[in-house]
Amino acid sequence: MTTTISSNLPSQLEISPTKLLITKQPIKLRESTESPFKSMMDTFKNTIISTSPTECEESSSSTITTPSEESLSSGEESSSISDSESKIITIATLLKPSNSVQDFTPLCNGAQETEIVKISNSINLSNFIIKHLVGKGGFGKVFQVVHVDTQKVYALKVIKKNHIIAKKSVVNTLAEKDILKKISHPFIVNLHYAFQNEKKLYLVMDFVNGGQLFYHLQKEAIFSEDQVRFYMAELILALEHLHDSNIVHRDLKPENILLDSQGHCILTDFGLAKLEVKTNNETFSFAGTLEYMAPEMIQHATCGKAVDWWSIGILMYDMMIGKPPFEHKNRALMQEKIISEKAKFPKFVSSSARSLINGLLTKDPTKRLGANGAIEIKRHPFFKSIQWRKIENKEITPPFVPSTKGIDDISNFDHASLKAHQRDSFSTSPTLSSSQQAYFDGFSFVRTPVLLESQK
């Protein structure tokens, strides 16, 4: 179903543009030698931007120690408090009368030439209350938030501009927003809002409270064959929809699959996804998680949509056996195993499951199961009991329902690992040049109520 996204924004959300003072002093962006999936870029030491008095106040939440927007920029760490003393971080209002603007002036020694860059948002951080930190990655952080007016619960993904510029990931980040803006599918996360300030990008998406598939796989070690069949069916439908739109995900793994409160799969994290993949002769950069990466990507050969079918084959093996089929502490040796070795199976894996996994893990992408479309996979004997239309309409009861106590419940998220990452990776952000800010022109987005209704 084709859905039209209206660019008309609700009048009650209109605010005056923010005025920024941007220095013309050259800024050197230093490339990090660390993995983009393991670290953030080093601290910029040249320039400090003063924050407005209306920046968010530091507070804390009852379950997870959560930094406010100020601590997201400054690196300060919130203190834990008991449930009886719990507070919700309230974002101080940034809304101004239509004839006023807000200045962010660099603190520099001596006179310095500046120019004015305007960032206009119809919605901003003041429209949300931050409650909990629920995710952490190389891109930044994900928070559970509540919309002030509607009281709806969302997930807020925070991305640092200087980080993605340094990592040369601007195109991927903008592609993530564009993909989520155009895609509507029951097993793919929805984007509701996108906005920015002078330092960061913000994506407001569905809050999916069942937790990561990875979290549940860690707890259970392995899933039953029926459970794997159900998850595979939903994910195949999600990938089929993406591929029909010429989109390749490129980072399919348990961490990027969420379970909703009913137990359905939700595919998320499109930070490495590629748009306009129409042939099998595309050139993909070496990106993704190595254990799930297709041989043709490792060999820097031409690639296509079949890279996702390889990844889902690895995922199926992981769910059934409890680990990926090709592992090694040495990354070079792991790459060699992926390129040359065959998957080995324990005796308890059924013949139909083995056949499906082997088909998906065919080294030659032109002969891989799914190379001619998802219909090849859907017709495999492993799925003979699956009623695809009922799966897509969510008419089949999921084999596992996560325990939740409400839409804002965060009990299915890994609290311990998140608490270890409360502090932001650096205390100051650099001043971006006007040409760098121009990368993000047109980033803001509001999904219209009409479009939201069409997704129900």
Curated annotation (Swiss-Prot):
Residues 50-83 have a biased composition (Low complexity). InterPro entries: AGC-kinase_C (IPR000961), Kinase-like_dom_sf (IPR011009), Prot_kinase_dom (IPR000719), Protein_kinase_ATP_BS (IPR017441), Ser/Thr_kinase_AS (IPR008271), STKc_AGC (IPR045270). Residues 384-455 form the AGC-kinase C-terminal domain. It is an enzyme of class 2 (transferase). One of its GO terms (molecular function) is ATP binding. Its EC number is 2.7.11.1. It comes from the Eukaryota. The active site is at residue 251. ATP binds at residues 134-142, 157. Residues 128-383 form the Protein kinase domain. Keywords: ATP-binding, Kinase, Nucleotide-binding, Phosphoprotein, Serine/threonine-protein kinase, Transferase. Residues 50-84 are annotated as: Disordered. This is Probable serine/threonine-protein kinase DDB_G0277449.
